[in-house]
Structures are given as structure tokens and as C-alpha cells.
Amino acid sequence: FEKYGHTLEGAAAALFEFNKGLIDALHTIVPAVKPQCAYYEMYGWQGMKALHDTIAYAKEKGMFVVTDGKRNDIGTTMEAYAVAHLGQVDVQGEKIAPFAGDSLTVNGYLGSDGILSLLDICDKQDKGIFVLVKTSNPSSGELQDLKLDSNESIYETMGHMCEAWGAEHMGKYGYSAVGAVVGATYPEQLKELREKLPHTFFLVPGYGAQGGGA
């Protein structure tokens, strides 16, 4: 703030300096970071530059970056999100990676129209996605726990869809590019889904303040 004053530039610079300190302290013992886009977007383009710089710094230190954007759309709009966060944009023949995260959280509840265009870019760039399946928030069951005619819950069905989407995008260690977000606040559902989705990486939010634990 001494350099920029009480401005968006100052706030964004403070964010990045704070993040650098965390990354410097943790990169030898923690393999990944998950910056939440909303906390950068609230500081405008200056905040988004701090997000870009944070991702670049984390990757420079050898960390895997999951960009927590929970993007949700269809077709070319979803493809644009994928290009922004995972791919490269064409600027007059020059290929430039705007943010260059390794993975992106997405909402799959628009169905295949919102996922398949992402996977083309994941294949080209060796990236991945994490799809919301059973989320950690208290009201998640209002929708996700509802039973369908198949007698499966909505979250179980979404989990199976993740396995199906990922079947043609398998890595050499037997896991697909399509991961699942499953909250630590629901340990029984977490255990159930882990057994049903053997080829799916799990992103498990909800530790600490939300009440989840190991």
C-alpha cells in the first residue's frame, strides 16, 4: 500500500505478496494449491493479474494448480472458459496461455454440453477438470441428495457421468482427466463414491472451518 496507496492495485499487490510467502513456505511439503477466483475477481483486473501471477509463481515452484472457478456454461462459451484457464488463446497467430492453471473446477449440471468442449482442450494441453458431485455446503442435499427414478441420487448419477466422461481421457496411472469434487463434510457419501469411482481423482473440500476432517 506504500507504493500504490489504498487502491485496487495496492490490494492486488498485497494479495500476491501474501501468496508468495505461503508458496515459499509450503512448496516443499505441499504438492498443490487451489486459488479461488472470486477473491481475485472482487479486486477487478488488478486482482485477476494477481491470480495470474500467483499461478505462475506456484508453477515455477513445482506446484500443481487447481483454479477454483466453478465455471458453468455450454458450447463455445464453456470452451472460452477452458481456453482462459487451461489452454492457449490465439492472438494474431501467437499462442498465449492467459492463466495456465493445471486443472479447473466446473459445474457439470448442464450436462455433456458443458463438459465435452473442456475435454478437447484438456487432451491438447495435458490438463484436467474437477466436476462438482457432492459438495461440502450444508444445503447441498436439497438438490444433490434427491432420488431419481433409477433410485440413484443426483450426486451418484453425476459421479457416474464423471466416470463416463473420463473413460476416453485416461492417464498412464489409471486415473482420468475428469475428477470429482466431493466434500469432506459428508464422509459416508465420500466413502461410497470412492468405491464407485475407481478411476476418478477426488478434490475434497470442507476441512477445517466447514467441519470436515480426516
Name what the model sees in each region:
Residues 1-25:
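N-terminal glycine-rich anion-binding loop in soluble enzyme alpha/beta folds
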Residues 33-35, 65-67, 102-106, 129-133, ...:
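Hydrophobic faces of well-ordered beta-strands that scaffold small-molecule active sites
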Residues 23-29, 55-60, 119-124, 194-197:
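Acidic (Asp/Glu)-rich catalytic clusters
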Residues 18, 22, 50-54, 81, ...:
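A general structural detector for well-ordered alpha-helical segments in enzyme core domains, enriched
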Residues 38-40, 70-74, 107-109, 134-138, ...:
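Active-site beta-loop-alpha junctions enriched in small/polar residues
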Residues 73-179:
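Conserved anion-binding
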Residues 29-31, 35-97, 189:
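N-terminal active-site wall of soluble small-molecule enzyme domains
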Residues 184-214:
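A C-terminal functional module that forms or caps the active site or interfaces directly
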